[in-house]
């Protein structure tokens, strides 16, 4: 029996058309909501779903590309305090974390999801490039300038 999957399962992804045993389809897949019977009406419903998903995918990609441009135009500036000990070693107090990067981006009206920036702890002076995951394969490179203020 041919069925159209309505959810991802071990037999395939959502909206896939598969062939399974009649009993499996009638007694498990269809009653549990994992599939619907293959028919012209259900095929039209599937095509409509696929076109809606395609439009949604396109919209998300375009928003991610706009956000990518905004992020790549930015250069965030942070200052950390440091001290020099008796042996002339530099000790930086603290670091710039992922949370601080997100807070600074919010000041520029850029809101990211929780896992967009991998765990970052910057404590070395200079310019750093942090990769930001926006959507599937779309990533932005955020420039972070870190200045260390040495106190004696």
Swiss-Prot record:
One of its GO terms (biological process) is translation. GO terms for molecular function: rRNA binding; structural constituent of ribosome. Keywords: Ribonucleoprotein, Ribosomal protein, RNA-binding, rRNA-binding. Pfam families: Ribosomal_L9_C, Ribosomal_L9_N. GO terms for cellular component: ribonucleoprotein complex; ribosome. PROSITE patterns: RIBOSOMAL_L9. InterPro entries: Ribosomal_bL9 (IPR000244), Ribosomal_bL9/RNase_H1_N (IPR009027), Ribosomal_bL9_bac/chp (IPR020594), Ribosomal_bL9_C (IPR020069), Ribosomal_bL9_C_sf (IPR036791), Ribosomal_bL9_N (IPR020070), Ribosomal_bL9_N_sf (IPR036935). Binds to the 23S rRNA. NCBIfam families: L9 (TIGR00158). This is Large ribosomal subunit protein bL9. The lineage of its organism: Bacteria, Bacillati, Mycoplasmatota, Mycoplasmoidales, Metamycoplasmataceae.
